[in-house]
Each structure stands twice: as structure tokens, then as C-alpha cells.
Amino acid sequence: KAQGWTTVMMRNVPHSYTCDKLIGLLESKGFSKWFDFVYVPINFTHMLGVGYAFVNLTSQERAEEFILAFDGFEGWDSSFSKEACTMHWSVCQGLDENISRYRNSPLMCEEVPAFYKPVLLKDGVRIEFPKPTKQLRTLRRRKGKQEEGEGEE
């Protein structure tokens, strides 16, 4: 990993999890105010999570501690999954890169409910996502495929 990496990918997140539910879990485990970006990609055909999430921590040191705390985590509040979480560095790194990746995504269209969109926080309090810098395309629903703007693998 490169120095200064702060964004992690959590795998084996239960399909029932949304950003709100994941934020609640992270806060309950003592990580309140440690993160400033959370996104749980959703399959809009089934209206369920796709099994992973992205979290940006406020420093590399916090990211490394977060990885240690959640790698192998099995305490999900869900009947959907009892798989252990595995932690990875995200391809997209840092708050600015995550904002750039999603601010002009079809995911940010008005018709997409807010609870399916990425969340930004400052000192543990939600803040508004920056406005798009260009015209947003409508989110396309494609059979058998994930929706655009869902994340990376």
C-alpha cells in the first residue's frame, strides 16, 4: 500500500446493510468521527446491498486500526450473512477521489432515494454531498448486472 491510503473496502457485508446501518455499526464499535465517507453499493433490481462497502478514514493510521478491527469481523446484525468480513484497500483513495468518483454518477440523480447514496460526514455529522458539476444521466437498470455507479471490484 502507498503511504497516505485511507479508503478501505469491506467485503462480505450482509445484503441487508445500507449506509445508515453500517454507520450505526461503526459508531457502536467506537469508530465515531473516524470516517468521513461511507458507501454501501446497492443492486437496484433487488434493492439490496451487493455485499461490500467503502469507508474512508480520516488518516492512514486510523485506516490501519480500522482494518485490524474489522478483518474477520462476524458480529453482523443480520440474518442474511454470517460470513466474516475481509478488509482490502480500495482502488479509489481519499475523500477527494471518492467525492470526484460519485458526485457526477447517475447514482446521485434525484430519483434515487438518499439512503442509497454515498454519505459524507464531518466530525461524525452528515454533511451535504457536493452538487454535480455536469448533467447527470438517469440511472439505468440492466438485467443481471449491477447498476452504474455502484462501486468497484
Predicted regions and their residues:
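Low-complexity RS/RG/RGG-rich segments used by eukaryotic RNA-binding proteins and nuclear co-regulators
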Residues: 74-103
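Non-catalytic, charged low-complexity extensions flanking SF2 helicase motor domains
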Residues: 103-153
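Alpha-helical solenoid scaffolds in eukaryotic macromolecular assemblies
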Residues: 55, 62, 86-94, 109, ...
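Low-complexity, flexible helical/coil segments
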Residues: 46-48, 74-76, 93, 121-127
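Generic structural motif recognizing short loop/turn segments at the entrances and edges of beta-strands
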Residues: 4, 34-36, 81-85, 111-117, ...
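Canonical RRM/RBD RNA-binding surface and closely related RRM-like beta-sheet modules
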Residues: 1-50, 58-83
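Alpha-helical structural motif
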Residues: 18, 53, 94-98
